[in-house]
Amino acid sequence: LKKIKIEEALIKVLSSPNHSNKNWITNQYDQTVMCDTVQKSGSDAAIIRIHNKDKAIAVSVDSSANYCKSHPTSGGKQIVCENWRNLISVGAKPLAITNCLNFGNPENEEVMGEFAECLEGIKEACEFLNYPVVSGNVSFYNGTNKKNIFPTPVIGGVGLINKLSIPIGHIFKKDKSNILLIGKTFGHLEQSCFLKENYSIEDGMPPEINLHNEKNNGESLLKLIDKNLILS
């Protein structure tokens, strides 16, 4: 691979439609109807206050077509865990999910295989995290000029925040605060936005996911947030 300056690489990633600011879309809609919005879109999850209660619900919607195309089973697990993390990151206990399963022509054996494997990954992650699927729908025959779309299951999750004082955002609150990394990093570059945007490389496998670690990390973070030990 050719050498690239980190500043140039970052600009390319942030300039991509997949990673750039989405405010031009969300600002066209009223996000504060009935004055119940605690946290708008743009953070890990949106938060809405429950009427006459010192509680709120958090909502996050997630997908990863690239992961699901490269390894459908792993991709299915990845998007459930991403959704799980996003809710926990704002102080919400994940309760349940719905899904929208978007795929190409099921008469194509490869597409049907992707569908079955994605479902297996979603099922495995949901069962392990005790994160039930309460509803969903399937959309087949998506494509253009006989070219099927990537397998694109979308997960929408809802979590409960027990106190309105709990929700946390993604913006730093105080100078000189400690920054903590929860979990391990493995330097995995395959299927990364860095390779795709800077080198047009979309090969390889998504990073491995350990459901035991996901659950332990998530539950530990929730405890820290409940004890007011996390600022953002």
Q: How does the language model describe each region?
A:
Residues 1-232:
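Glycine/proline-enriched, intrinsically flexible loops and inter-domain linkers
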